[in-house]
Amino acid sequence: AGYIDIVEANIFDEKKIRALFKEADICINLIGILFEKKRGNTFKNIHSILPSLLAKLCKEYNLKHFIHVSALGINDAIDSEYAKSKLEGEANVLKNFPLATILRPSVVYSVDDNFTTNFMTLINRLPVFPIYYEGKTKFAPIHCSDLTDTIYHVISKNIYSKIIECTGPEILTFKELLEKLQILIGKKRRS
């Protein structure tokens, strides 16, 4: 049995990242963004360049495993800069550390997460909520504890060189997801 060491670090500080690898056996990359906000926090930097660096360091420091968390559905959304950067990141990871396991989760949710909280806030405040593509986009949300169970399984069963899609038990359209959130916050749906 091992332990998890949580350290705050600037992901653009390669010297600091290298220091973390000296004591590591496994690297799990959970870093990702949904929107480009700040200088430096671009899809390319976060989803492509950083995973490439981490994979190279895994190889250089002879880590046992690299688990890279990507995103589900990116093969079908190639017109999206987000998806392109995720696919590029996956390719870079596998090129630099072929034994890596890539996890592609659907929307990950938990108590007080950004995704759920942001949508609940918007639903509560807006008189009308815009739904694109008639709300038919499908999701299979996965709870964060189920995703961590998957990560544990990958490590404990020595699963290498695989791409694993991670979904929850229920497939919902975006409209159904919003309706569930409305029920949670007690907001009645307008007819």
Question: What do these predicted ranges mean?
Answer:
Residues 2-60, 72-76:
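NAD(P)H-binding glycine-rich loop region in Rossmannoid oxidoreductase-like domains
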Residues 13, 49-53, 65, 88-89, ...:
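Conserved cofactor-binding/catalytic machinery of classical short-chain dehydrogenase/reductase
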Residues 121-142, 146, 150-167:
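A conserved pocket-lining segment of Rossmann-fold NAD(P)-dependent short-chain dehydrogenase/reductase
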Residues 60-65, 97-98:
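A short helix->loop->beta-strand "cap" motif at the edges of active sites that frequently abuts
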Residues 70, 91-112, 117, 121, ...:
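Conserved beta-loop-beta element that borders a ligand/cofactor-binding pocket
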Residues 44-48, 79-90, 94, 109, ...:
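Short-chain dehydrogenase/reductase
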